[in-house]
């Protein structure tokens, strides 16, 4: 089978770990230090075509400004003649949303810890004049120690000098404040606080406070703050949530008030921000202003005769998500996205089965180089869902099928994945089927 080696400057780039409309995020390793990183890759042609230069500049600048232990760190920005590479901290614990899906809902003590860390991160952003505007569990990651990391500053805003109100409607509808939906000017700080309240409700309840199958109905509920807390919520957390989900931004509780709340303060240990470092924006200017000689070397070797061979350092980072628990020790409290499975069928047979099942579910499929994209309506018929499926060889005649969301609601994606797997039982391999651990370890490439 074929093996892919790709280098971008000092980074050895591996598999795709995330994909959106305008960018891919790939796992990579710094060959100088051996550290793992995530690299967000964007085509310059796409950025120019969609007039996103200012937005990308803003996202990079903001991530350089807001350095905090509970915010994903940006290391550097690189460029080739055709692409931009944003090198980020690699967060290994998956999304907070994955933990909610795995457990159904979280206990108050665990929810409180995550909420405290979220509020600390948001407060740090606000003191720097930055408003996130797209806070939701999918943008909250967990590290190996279970600490929260805020990510995805693509919709963030820095207010213009002398302008106190923001006017652009951004974010995921279920988490957006009423004043944002109104289309009038709004205070970015108050809007972020509302989103934090929705997140707190979701991690405690396991479902959204505001949910409808049509947008007008959803907007009506949000504008009226029409929700009810389940019976397992304590009186103290109910009181705090109602103060946060106040539809009037002028009377809504502020960060300082949240930090004084008795429920919030229980076992609260404030996180200190990283020591102030001089913010250097020269690499951003170099990337976007096309300074001569600023390009990083990019080297790709690939033929398309078979799936990518996954090497050892990629396998290790995936070990806790794979259903190959006999290979590696596994922490029982470690939850990572597990929307992937293993098969011993030929790649062409795997793809044919996936396409047939997807078509029966009403999804269109497009396959190239052992990578399949599926597109269709989500189960609630309220929006599009796009899924990317890629096959990797992890050992001779043993293939990992990685399934990830490219667009759409995360909860709908998990429903889709469960249904897809239930229809692919004939090709999914279980570890009990008898391949020795020693055989797999011996055949992983280094």
UniProtKB/Swiss-Prot annotation:
What compartments host this protein?
A: Cytoplasm; Nucleus
Q: Where are the stretches annotated Activation loop?
A: 152-179
Q: Where is the active site?
A: 134
Q: Which residues carry this modification: Phosphoserine?
A: 156
Q: Per UniProt, which keywords does this protein have?
A: ATP-binding, Cytoplasm, Kinase, Manganese, Nucleotide-binding, Nucleus, Phosphoprotein, Serine/threonine-protein kinase, Transferase
Q: Where is this region: PPI?
A: 336-365
Describe what happens upon changing residue 175 to D: Increases kinase activity
UniProt main location, coarse: cytoplasm
Q: Where is the Protein kinase domain?
A: 11-264
Record's domain comment? The activation loop within the kinase domain is the target of phosphorylation/activation by upstream protein kinases. The PPI motif mediates the interaction with the ABI (abscisic acid-insensitive) phosphatases. The C-terminal part (309-446) of the protein is required for the phosphorylation of CBL, but is not involved in autophosphorylation.
- Recorded protein name is CBL-interacting serine/threonine-protein kinase 24
Per the record, the gene is CIPK24
């Amino acid at each position: 089978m074929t093996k892919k080696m790709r280098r971008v400057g000092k980074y050895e780039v591996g598999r795709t770990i995330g994909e959106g409309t305008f960018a891919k995020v790939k796992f990579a390793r710094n060959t100088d230090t051996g550290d793992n990183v995530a690299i967000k890759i964007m085509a310059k042609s796409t950025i120019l075509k969609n007039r996103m230069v200012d937005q990308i500049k803003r996202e990079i600048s903001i991530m350089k400004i807001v350095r905090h232990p509970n915010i994903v760190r940006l290391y550097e920005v690189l460029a080739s003649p055709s692409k931009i590479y944003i090198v980020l901290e690699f967060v290994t614990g998956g999304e907070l949303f994955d933990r909610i899906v795995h457990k159904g809902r979280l206990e108050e003590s665990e929810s409180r810890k995550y909420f405290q860390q979220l509020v600390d991160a948001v407060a740090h952003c606000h003191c720097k004049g930055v408003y996130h505007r797209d806070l939701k569990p999918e943008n909250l990651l967990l590290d190996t120690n279970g600490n929260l990391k805020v990510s995805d500053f693509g919709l963030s805003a820095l207010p213009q000098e002398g302008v106190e109100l923001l006017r652009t409607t951004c974010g995921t509808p279920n988490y957006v404040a009423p004043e944002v939906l109104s289309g009038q000017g709004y205070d970015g700080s108050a809007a972020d606080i509302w989103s934090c309240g929705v997140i707190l409700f979701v991690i405690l309840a396991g479902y959204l406070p505001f949910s409808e199958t049509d947008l007008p109905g959803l907007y009506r509920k949000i504008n009226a703050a029409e929700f009810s807390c389940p019976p397992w919520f304590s009186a103290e957390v109910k009181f705090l949530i109602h103060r946060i989900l106040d539809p009037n931004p002028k009377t809504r509780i502020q960060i300082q008030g949240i930090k004084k709340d008795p429920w919030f303060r229980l076992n609260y240990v404030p996180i200190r921000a990283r020591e102030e470092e001089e913010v250097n924006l020269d690499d951003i200017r170099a990337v976007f202003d096309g300074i001569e000689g600023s390009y990083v070397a990019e080297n790709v070797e690939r033929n398309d005769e078979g799936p990518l061979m996954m090497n050892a350092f990629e396998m290790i980072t995936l070990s806790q998500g794979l259903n190959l628990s006999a290979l590696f020790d596994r922490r029982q409290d470690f939850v990572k996205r597990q929307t992937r499975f293993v098969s011993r069928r030929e790649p062409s047979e795997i793809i044919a089965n996936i396409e047939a099942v997807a078509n029966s579910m009403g999804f269109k499929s497009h396959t190239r180089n052992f990578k399949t994209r599926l597109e269709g309506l989500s189960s609630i018929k309220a929006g599009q869902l796009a899924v990317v499926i890629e096959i990797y060889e992890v050992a001779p005649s043993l293939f990992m099928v990685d399934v990830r969301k490219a667009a759409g609601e995360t909860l709908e994606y998990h429903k889709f994945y469960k249904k897809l797997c239930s229809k692919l039982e004939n090709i999914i391999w279980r570890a009990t089927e008898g391949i020795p651990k020693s055989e797999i370890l011996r055949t992983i490439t280094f």
